[in-house]
Amino acid sequence: QTFTWMIEGEVVHRDSLGNEQVIRPGQVNLMTAGRGIAHTEDSVVDGARLHAAQLWIALPEHERRREPAFQNHPDLPVVDVGGFHATVLAGSALGHVSPATVYTPLVGIDLTAAGAARAELPLQADFEYAALVLRGTATVGGAALAPGEWLYFAPGGEQLAVRCDAAAQLLLLGGLPLGEDILIWWNFVARTQAEMQAALDDWNAGRLAPVRAGSPAAALQAPTLQGTRLRG
């Protein structure tokens, strides 16, 4: 699954199912690739500033060949906690449930503060977590983080202290460890080297469904493995 959280600017999504959707700030686009989907993402206004967080969510083995799908979520649950404006992007948190469809136990929260803020967030003990600062600076679990910096937390925690001294925005992501090895190359996810090679061959030969909604972008060629041995 490709999960896009739009922060600034507008992007139009088009895909091989025929969807065409503009995503705006405060909205989520969720594309489930399943057995296969092609898509493009283009700026609505050329040269405009864009800022988004795009995350990939691995489907478990028993779900990964499901039918492809696309969702746009313009309305997400929001709660104020300790001066943070908390948006529940995925899963269940802070007494709210996101409408986004996911296939493993996980959670995603955007924490945005206009000024100084401090919160103690409850954690699920069997989840692993990561924090990512998007704008400003924040202290998470006692560690100071700058924009673009990640901090990982192993399972076992029950609470997490988050604070900022000025305006900031960060993501808190968590979930049960997947427990499966996956391979990633370019825009493809597979379980074996042979499966990855077959997907690359099909794409570069034009055997996969094209984007149907009139995207101006031409299909890109996937880089070949060229003797590379992938490891999960």
Role assignments for model-derived ranges:
Residues Q1-G232:
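Jelly-roll (double-stranded beta-helix
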